[in-house]
Amino acid sequence: AGYGAGSILAYYTSASDKNGQIQCLAYSKDNGRTFTKYEKNPVLRPSDGLKDFRDPKVFWYAPESKWVMIVSADKEMRFYDSHNLKDWNYLSSFGEGYGVQPCQFECPDMVELPVDGDINHKKWALIVNVNPGCYFGGSATQYFSGYFDGTKFICDNMPNVTKWLDWGKDHYATVCFSNTGDRVVAVPWMSNWQYCNIVPTRQFRSANALPRELGLYTQDNDIYLSAAPVAETKNLRKESKDVPSFTVDKDYHIESLLTDNEGAYELSLNIEAG
């Protein structure tokens, strides 16, 4: 982009009544301490004047030595590319009619991962955060596995197939780090648009969930995205308790699970269907 080695570029959505939602650039030459807005902002506008056009995610596409940007555009994702990080060209779109519908697409991300740990067999996972109307209420994170050829994303599944990254109520705005070596590590926002505006707050709303390492695996001739807490979270463990095997009929109570713990618990369960 011409700002020198070690510079940091930040892409963000600027929103106003006059200009709508547009994508802008800011750069830092002091290791992120301060940022300067690019004098020729915006770097990207919706060609059709779309109102909901936000959440840019930029990644390096090595096979063509170029940068790719994904932007959420109402009920689809739009792909753009650039060789100088300033001038962006439209490539394609994906998502209309796919997955849970009709939902607002937001906060995209896309990563390439080995399937079942095989580095010679890789697939792309397109992460799409959607709101509202999800299966368990409000907002959630779905994903699509498939192929990306540098121009368009081709989904493995039929449009009516929906895959959820997490089945909890508080999992949204999932984004991946780009400096975690061989691992792909993601962090979601631990909240839901059903009630996030009434959560007590000062400088922020809710919190982030635990970081998790992503992976692709096969099951029943299909490909799914796994999300396991990163290994570093084991350092948070303190007191532990083993519970012997038991059969669950209706209710089963375990008294005083951890005597010195008044906060969160981690449960590791092996469940066998009766």
Model-derived segments and their meaning:
Residues 119, 147-169, 173-274:
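Beta-rich accessory regions
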Residues 32, 65, 221-222:
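Detector for glycine-centered tight turns/loop "hinges" at secondary-structure junctions
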Residues 1-3, 32-60, 71, 89-112, ...:
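Surface loop/turn signatures of beta-propeller and other carbohydrate-active proteins
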Residues 4, 19-20, 52, 104, ...:
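A short, structural micro-pattern
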